Amino acid sequence: DGDIGFWFTGKMPVRSAKVDRRLPTPGTGEYDWKGDIPFDQMPQVVNPKQGFLVNWNNKPAPWFDNGDDSEWGPFWPITDIANEIKDIAPLTTSKVAHVGLHAGTRHMVASALLPLILGAAERTDADNDPKLHAALQYLRAWNLYQWQGDVASGILDTWMGLAGVNALADDFGPMMPAVSLDGDGTRGGGPKIGMIAALSVTVRALQGPQASLPLKYDYLKGKSRDEIIIGALKQAIGVLEATKGKEMSKWGRQPSWIKFDPLPPIPATARGTYIQIVEAAKPDLNGMDILPPGQSEDPQSPHYGDQRELAGYWLFKPMLYKREDLVK
């Protein structure tokens, strides 16, 4: 009938009001759970006003407080995905596939971080420094997508860790986790939750009052946000010069890989090895999927590598729903 909806399920605890979910809960009884959240109080929606639903491991609703996870923040990919979906008409499976490609190859946090750097450069005399100017030119020309040899993402990833330390180290010192993803701007290996939380706080601290959720605590201790941002960029240039040489064009991103030993690997991006795109059409379902290691993931299988090259190019194979289609 064309209806869409979702219901968030599971047994979610009603916690004691005394519990601070950021800290371990004492096991002395008075902090025990008070039952489960009723189903009608869980996030759910049917036929939302925007006409679509999207998800990328994000919170099920802004108001829902699931205290067991913190991998959210102003940079989570769901915002870019929603903005892209709303501008697609008509919405087809092939166009949805491109949304996945864009989400998987776009730098995960650049859309939140890049405006901080470029804004600080506009407000300061950073461009008077030849090295800063050259780095800023790479960042200004960047389309936020990652590719082998991409200099801008290498600069941003290095800046990210240094900016986090400069912004938060006064409070966290040796407890400060590395503010990074997994070295290439994707989540291929999965960052620690502490890294994500630190990055979220760093972004909000550097955004200041303009943050969607401004911080109440002054982690910067009155220091200039622009000074921290440009200072971290200077440091990043120094680190990259020391590790990759003076020639900035050689600071490009090196890809990581999804291995298919003994076959050659494919480039690793923010994706699963199994992806399906299904349209609930009438009279038949319409869909495509990709599963590069095969269902068995057995290197001895004759079909182990059938989909490897397709996956490397973000391509899909048709999903067959009828037995007669199998013999065509």
What feature does the model see in each segment?
Residues 1-328:
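C-terminal/peripheral segments of proteins
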